[in-house]
From Swiss-Prot:
Claim: Transferase is one of the keywords in the record: yes
Keyword Transferase: yes
EC identifiers of the protein: 2.8.4.1
Protein name per the record: Methyl-coenzyme M reductase II subunit beta
Record's catalysed reaction(s): coenzyme B + methyl-coenzyme M = methane + coenzyme M-coenzyme B heterodisulfide
Gene name per UniProt: mrtB
Assembly behavior: MCR is a hexamer of two alpha, two beta, and two gamma chains, forming a dimer of heterotrimers.
GO MF annotation, one: coenzyme-B sulfoethylthiotransferase activity
Catalytic class of the enzyme: transferase
InterPro entries reported for this sequence: Me_CoM_Rdtase_asu/bsu_C (IPR008924), Me_CoM_Rdtase_asu_N_sub2 (IPR015823), Me_CoM_Rdtase_bsu (IPR003179), Me_CoM_Rdtase_bsu_C (IPR022679), Me_CoM_Rdtase_bsu_N (IPR022680), Me_CoM_Rdtase_Fd-like_fold (IPR009024)
Binding site for coenzyme M: Y367
Keywords carried by this UniProt record: Methanogenesis, Transferase
Length: 443
């Protein structure tokens, strides 16, 4: 039986209807089978850069940037023997013959997608088991294939896993996972938020709405892990995922289309009109000046509408500039204008606006330590919004026309090449809707 009465229509990234009258809970991370697959595969999937390993060994470039160890060069035809190596990796990683282990060659064997069996994830305390097991299997497969002796085995290890375990992360490694090691988490339950925005953008091949969707799915699923989306707050997060992340009722698409030649301000005007029309808000009182103060008929739904408007405003503004740097100020001043225009709270009840203040400073103000693409929901600057700010950053980086020093191509090439091979990572809107269709009559 459904807990919530809300029904939504789901549209794709091109504004095409996918399914209608879908119960809100059908897109819940706890019930939707596609989101379940995404979360499971995020934890069990590892990208292995065989071309990188081969090049690293050939030059003895080991352990990270500017590190060379003359005399430790190994000239091994790793890519040429990718199929043999992949078979050996699968045999070592696999637990049972018919389990869900998957080892797939990409780009003619230059990269591998290694998905460890789910049983390894279930029987481990944390998700780093996938990187460690895939890395160990890759090391052994290379040693066995080329009969590497005991004196050069450590060189192979360093080419694969980098400086680990001297470092807490995998500095200089040629294996990569979406999820960073748990020791880097800012707080409990932040694992799914600890994914670079650029990783998400590269995985969705810079499709704006799909990038925002994947970001929203990961962010909002994390809210269920941290305890934020429990009880009285569950519906707030489900509606946020639906309207901002999954383009429910085609709201984001409609707002962008209506304001294709507009500004952040015109998006806000369109949003307020739509919210009144859909009976989400109403006029509370009118001042002598004619200024109208609004109140929500449905607080959680208003937040979802405001979040959808925030994404639309980001797309309109950054899309006009084709430069992602303005995303922080867009998130900030969209909320500022919205609050002044309506008398209502901004997205995430002020947390998105507050996040944007720090985000502006640390992404391009006096400090300017890094572009928007290297931020994530676990970052000390952008962690404060409960899942509503980062989807806008993903959209902005998808629209960027190469202005960023930290571009998806530079920071996330391997992750993008490998993870984009998984259909429901590349096109989450479509596949989450399909998952919802499978279960909607059971709710």
């Amino acid at each position: 039986m459904a807990i919530y009465e809300d029904k939504i229509d789901l549209y794709d990234a091109n504004g095409k209807l996918l399914d209608e009258n879908v119960p809100l809970e059908a897109i819940s991370p706890l019930k939707n089978p596609t989101i379940g697959k995404i979360v499971n595969d995020v934890k069990r999937s590892v990208a292995v850069n065989l071309a990188g390993i081969e090049n690293s060994l050939k030059k003895a470039a080991l352990g990270g940037k500017a590190n060379f160890i003359p005399g430790r060069e190994l000239d091994l035809d790793i890519v040429e023997n990718a199929e043999i190596i992949a078979e050996k990796i699968k045999k070592m990683v696999q637990v049972d013959e018919n389990d869900d282990t998957n080892v797939k060659m990409i780009n003619n064997g230059q990269q591998l997608l290694v998905q460890v069996p789910t049983i390894r994830i279930e029987r481990a305390a944390d998700y780093t088991v996938s990187t460690l097991v895939a890395g160990a299997a890759t090391i052994q497969a290379i040693i066995d294939t080329f009969d590497v002796d005991m004196f050069d085995a450590s060189t192979v290890k360093t080419a694969v896993l980098g400086r680990y375990p001297q470092t807490v992360d995998f500095t200089g490694a040629n294996v990569a996972a979406m999820l960073s090691p748990p020791v880097l988490l800012e707080g409990l339950g932040y694992g799914l938020r600890n994914i670079l925005t650029n990783h998400i953008v590269a995985t969705t091949k810079k499709n704006t709405l799909n990038a925002a969707a994947l970001s929203s799915i990961l962010e909002q699923t994390a809210m269920f892990e941290t305890g934020d989306a429990v009880g009285a707050f569950e519906r707030l997060h489900l509606l946020g995922l639906a309207y901002q992340g999954l383009n429910a009722d085609n709201l984001v698409y409609d707002l962008v289309k209506e304001n294709k030649k507009g500004t952040v301000g015109t998006v806000i005007a369109s949003l307020v009109e739509r919210a009144i029309e859909d009976k989400v808000i109403k006029v509370s009182k009118e001042m002598p000046s004619g200024f109208r103060v609004y109140e929500p008929i449905d607080w959680a739904l208003w937040n979802a509408y405001a979040a959808a408007g925030l994404l639309a405003a980001t797309i309109v503004n950054i899309g006009a500039a084709r430069a992602a740097q303005g995303v922080a100020s867009t998130v900030l001043y969209y909320n500022d204008i919205l609050e002044y225009e309506t008398g209502l709270p901004g997205v995430d009840f002020g947390r998105a606006e507050g996040t944007a203040v720090g985000f502006s400073f640390f992404s391009h103000s006096i400090y300017g330590g890094g572009g928007p693409g290297i931020f994530h929901g676990n970052h000390v600057v952008t962690r404060h919004s409960k899942g509503f700010a980062l989807p806008c950053v993903a959209a902005a980086m998808s629209l960027d026309a190469g202005t960023q020093m930290f571009s998806p191509e530079r920071t996330s090439g391997l992750v993008g090449q490998v993870y984009s091979e998984i259909d429901y990572f590349r096109e989450p809107i479509k596949y989450v809707a399909e998952g919802a269709a499978k279960i909607k009559n059971k709710i």
